[in-house]
Amino acid sequence: MRIREIGPSDLDGVMAIEEVSFPTPWSRGMFIEDFPRDFSDTLVAAGTEDEVLGYSVCWTIAGESHLLNIAVHPSRRGEGIGRALVSECIRRSARAGASLIFLEVRAGNEAAKRLYRSMGFAFRGVRKGYYTDTGEDAVILDREVRKSDAAR
């Protein structure tokens, strides 16, 4: 597996994962809009045949990074792909000069919360009713980004 920037040929694979992972998936257009943005890193985890195993979207603006979206194909979860994507987001955040990375995660997504906590993310708050499909709360987690993270 390798982590690389998204390309146009990855979009079908990203959309397939997005649509099975989230009740209200991002549109194809939302991903396409991110391609040219200087402050955005849209990454894919690619397998041996260059198939998309997972992806992440992270923005770095004004010294902070926001991990907006991350998903791994359901058949490949538990293999460390999500961890690798988050690690690469942290590395790129450090290289971009961010001092903090934060994210929102569904309050009921225990597996994701365990992963983030194991990577040094800490609880910072709750966004009540954040997810419009169910009204579920979002838990806000963040982590300091250190200069040493750039070398990961």
Residue ranges, per PLM feature:
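Conserved catalytic-core motifs of GNAT/GCN5-like acyltransferases
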Residues: 104, 117, 122-139
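Conserved SAM-binding loop
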Residues: 3, 78, 104-105, 123
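Acetyl-CoA-dependent GNAT
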Residues: 2-77, 86-96, 144-151
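Conserved GNAT acetyl-CoA-binding A-motif
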Residues: 93-104, 127
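Conserved G/P- and acidic residue-centered "switch" motifs that form tight phosphate/ATP-binding loops
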Residues: 80-82
